[in-house]
Amino acid sequence: IFAFLLAIYRFSVLTTVGGRVSAQLKSDKANTNNPLGRVLKIHEDNPNMDTETLELKLSEGVLKETPELESGLTLLKIIAAIAPLMGLLGTVTGMILTFQAITIFGAGDPKAMAGGISSALITTVLGLLVAIPTVLMFTIVNGRAQRIIHILDEQTTGMVAEHTEAKLRS
């Protein structure tokens, strides 16, 4: 449930941010309510800077925005990786208990063994029930974050190119 709530929250945040970035793409004035606007503001605030320094400043701006865009993704990835392992741990523990019961009581009652094995496998199923949707949610949310980061990279490259062209013309 935690992974689902985290994914929904990050998806909604990134959808809002993505909408603001899209609006910023259509605007000439930098609006600091979105990552692209904050990066554009760096360009606006430094019109006479040499190209190399501007490129470094813009890259720094993108790097500052990236952690907020990728927030929560590592936790989703960890949950997706650990859930099946926890299920497997439960299965192994259940199988150990089943074999201990066989050692004590013998293998005469297959129903008793089947029940133990069945309950042991339930933990694997539960682990997979957590992991599979979490991997899917991680992929969707990560894709949304990476699209925004790609826009930032693309726009900063364009700003550096325009800045270089303007310097060459003058």
Enumerate the predicted regions with their spans.
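Hydrophobic alpha-helical transmembrane segments
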Residues: I1-V17
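Alpha-helical transmembrane segments
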Residues: F2-L6, L89-V92, I96, A131
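Residue-level signature of catalytic and energy-coupling elements of molecular machines
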Residues: F4, L40, G87, I117, ...
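Predominantly long cytosolic amphipathic alpha-helical stalk/bundle segments
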Residues: S12-A107, L136-S170
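Pore-lining and gate-forming transmembrane alpha-helices of multi-pass membrane transport proteins
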Residues: K111-N142
